[in-house]
UniProtKB/Swiss-Prot annotation:
One of its GO terms (cellular component) is mitochondrial matrix. Pathway: Cofactor biosynthesis; coenzyme A biosynthesis; CoA from (R)-pantothenate: step 4/5; Cofactor biosynthesis; coenzyme A biosynthesis; CoA from (R)-pantothenate: step 5/5. ATP binds at residues 364-371. This is Bifunctional coenzyme A synthase. Residues 359-562 form the DPCK domain. Pfam families: CoaE (PF01121), CTP_transf_like (PF01467). It comes from the Eukaryota. GO terms for molecular function: ATP binding; dephospho-CoA kinase activity; pantetheine-phosphate adenylyltransferase activity.
Length: 562
């Protein structure tokens, strides 16, 4: 059967019976849709009757919200799918205006409409499919040539008949003051509320948080998106999506799921944000992790003469397949870890480089562990060129940079034996941009020439991959000598600790050294592959092996020699 880029899944089974069926339903849908799957909830709708079904309001109860969590949790097994549960027809008891008569536009108009509704004979019965297509197009903007499929998932022998759940689902949402509730208890609506987060690589746990906030809010939802100082403590912050990109994805998702709401997406620059100062806000949605932050917001409001916000705490989604060193919850941090070793952007085409040898430029801030990664790559078969060693060669008496450097900086930079005292030379140029440029204008072209000669040597030895290990790779403009730039990153605090331990410098001196270099973010912005030595050595080894295996695949699949 054809695979569609976008689809609409209409769920008609009563919620209590639907929860145990979710996994096979989502698996069936994931075989047909490969990008965006919208989900429309209409429990009890009959597509087999004589009358054309109409969309009707679904009251927002704790059962509905818990079901939304179950669905997004199940969708996490199909991460290629961008699942979006549409909330237009889900209403709180206190706000039940009529459903909009116009068709709702969607960012990715469905090419196929699917349903869990089943005919008695298990066939693709045309009248039912026609009802389904008419229903879908009456609610949402769909592609002109809309297809329809009745899903008949394999529920397994032990699953049917399905018994209603007598025990409420685990609570997804908890008000700050716990109250006894039943699954059928309506959720209270509010006019205006807020939610905040980083929202990097919008995932299913984010979608639960945002969906609950959208159900609670009836007029406006303020969404604080963490930026600047609030990002510094994040794991692998260099791999965070830019603020504008995160906001763009957020906005599309929010407008898709509840276009009747007004959304105010603003940068979150401190822990309180608008929730701490806006008197018109009534509630704040937090996660288990950020609940204490929500309490702090309320204390801040009270101190400033504002009423407390009603806090709604959302459970975290468990990651069903966490890898070593990853969190056991669905999180952006884990997704960023999974990016390590992957190709982030297309390689450079370098027809001017020697054919038959693929050249990697390896860089990273001081203390990043770049050289240890180079040795791991060497162990896998790469020919490694150490630019520091080339620098030593160029400075040595008789070396290509020796005489020009002495002429530029004088003989007082020499040891008694005539060799260049690099410590004295370093003190001359450190903090003096003019003097540093004089030195780099002499040395960098020489090192680049020596590196090219080393690449030629690698080709002569039959090496397929050559790695240029260079801290100044990008500052020196040597990216034009490589097909890919690989960067090793670690937090600056860890880099300082390593430099102090390795080189015997003070923390201030170590920080000064780092400030004189390109930042990890600047390096990553121009990189094709990112690695990190933050964890145990065997974790780094696995990263390098993954990156190496993917590199070999790229080389073998290349249409011609690089």
């Amino acid at each position: 059967m054809a695979v569609f880029r976008s689809g609409l899944l209409v769920l008609t089974t009563p919620l209590a019976s639907l929860v145990p069926r979710l996994a096979p339903i989502l698996t069936s849908a994931a075989r047909l849709v490969n990008h965006t799957l919208y989900v429309h909830l209409q429990p009890g709708m009959n597509l087999g009757g004589p009358a054309q079904p109409q969309s009707s309001p679904v009251q927002a109860t704790f059962e509905v919200i818990d079901f939304i969590t179950h669905l997004y949790a199940g969708a996490d097994l199909h991460r290629h799918l961008d699942v979006r549960i549409l909330l237009t027809n889900i209403r709180t008891k206190s706000f039940l205006p009529p459903l909009p008569s116009s068709v709702q536009n969607l960012a990715h108009p469905p090419e196929v409409v699917l349903t869990d509704f089943q005919t008695l004979d298990g066939s693709q019965y045309n009248p039912v499919k026609q009802q389904l297509e008419r229903y879908a197009t009456s609610c949402y903007s769909c592609c002109p040539q809309l297809s329809s499929v009745l899903l008949y998932p394999d529920y397994g022998p032990g699953m049917l008949p399905v018994q209603p759940l007598d025990v409420p689902l685990p609570s997804t949402i908890r008000p700050a003051s716990p109250v006894a509730r039943s699954a059928k208890q309506p959720v209270r609506g509010h006019q205006r509320g807020a939610v905040g987060g980083t929202f990097d690589r919008l995932h299913n746990a984010h979608k639960v948080l945002l969906s609950v906030a959208c159900i609670l809010a009836q007029e406006q939802l303020v969404v604080g998106v963490a930026d600047k100082d609030l990002l510094k403590s994040k794991l692998l912050p260099e791999l965070l999506q830019p603020y504008t990109e995160r906001v763009e994805h957020l906005s599309e998702f929010l407008v898709d799921i509840k276009p009747s709401l007004s959304f105010d997406l603003i940068p979150l620059l401190d822990p309180y944000g608008p929730a701490g100062s806006d008197p018109s806000l009534e509630f704040l949605v937090v996660s288990e992790e950020t609940y204490r932050g929500g309490m702090a917001v309320n204390r801040f409001r009270l101190e400033n003469g504002l009423e407390e916000l009603t806090l709604y705490q959302i459970q975290l989604l468990k990651d069903l397949n966490p890898k070593e060193n990853e969190e056991d919850k669905v999180s952006s941090s884990s997704f960023r870890q999974q990016m390590l070793g992957n190709l982030l952007r297309p390689p450079h085409k370098r027809p001017e480089l020697p054919p038959g040898c693929y050249v990697i430029g390896l860089t990273g801030i001081s203390g990043s562990g770049k050289s240890s990664v180079a040795q791991r790559l060497k162990g896998l078969g790469a020919y490694v060129i150490d630019s520091d060693q080339l620098g030593h060669r160029s400075y040595a008496p008789g070396g290509p940079a020796y005489q020009p450097v002495v002429e530029a900086f004088g003989t007082d930079i020499l040891h008694k034996d005539g060799t260049i005292n690099r410590k004295v030379l370093g003190s001359r140029v450190f903090g003096n941009k003019k003097q540093l440029k004089i030195l780099t204008d002499i040395v960098w072209p020489v090192i680049a020439k020596l590196a090219r000669e080393e690449v030629d040597q690698a080709v002569a030895e039959g090496k397929r991959v050559c790695v240029i290990d260079a801290a100044v790779l990008l500052e020196a403009g040597w990216q034009n000598m490589v097909h890919e730039v690989w960067t090793v990153v670690i937090p600056e605090t860890e880099a300082v600790r390593r430099i102090v331990e390795r080189d015997g410098l003070s923390e201030a001196a170590a920080q000064s050294r780092l400030q004189s270099q390109m930042s990890g973010q600047q390096l990553v912005d121009q990189s094709h592959v990112v690695l990190s030595t933050l964890w145990e050595p065997h974790v780094t080894q696995r990263q390098v092996e993954k990156a190496w295996a993917l590199l070999q695949k790229r080389i073998s699949e290349a249409p011609s020699d690089p």
